[in-house]
Amino acid sequence: MRHLYLHGFASSPASAKARFFEQRLREHGIPLEIPDLAQGDFEHLTLSSQLAVIDRATAGQECVLIGSSLGGYLAALYAAQHPHVTRLLLLAPAFCFPSRFPAELGKETAENWRRTGLLPVFHYAHGEPRNLSYAIVEDGRQYDDFPDFTQPAILAHGLHDSVVPPSLSREYSVSHPNVRLHLLDSDHQLTNVLDQIWQFSGPFLEGKA
């Protein structure tokens, strides 16, 4: 059984959460694969390009997916179409990303992005703004806001998340009995509750619960 961590938007395999789960799983003899979903080309990033990276990484083998923010949404999208995903841990999953992201920019900024084709976005891994193509919006329109996967999953979401509303995870969990939702005293990063998340997700990720 393979385990993959899918990082968030404008992040990288070197994120704090990725390294936390890599270390914890290593302590239990489980290697964690952390692909670079942008493949070094953030400007031309799309949901389809990231799903293709995930598909190559899993190589059709049974796997467990851990996804953070946009990585959580991508994990849900991928699992909905690929039964070789056996279970998921979604951390503040960015449901509705294709519709929410441009809307939250505001009408003027979103229209300027559509017109020029590029938007400067702060990239956390690089510590500076990087251009992002409008193709991520156009490509994203083909994907469901709430991917309908049936595999067992744990969702962890911060009650004080100002980036992805916890109400989205609540809405998803109500209609999906395969999902266990944990609402935590944290923000979008969840860094202050990682040990708590490990307590209820560790056995699940190992296939023991």
Region locations from a protein language model:
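Active-site loop/turn elements of alpha/beta-hydrolase fold enzymes
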Residues: 34-40, 93, 186
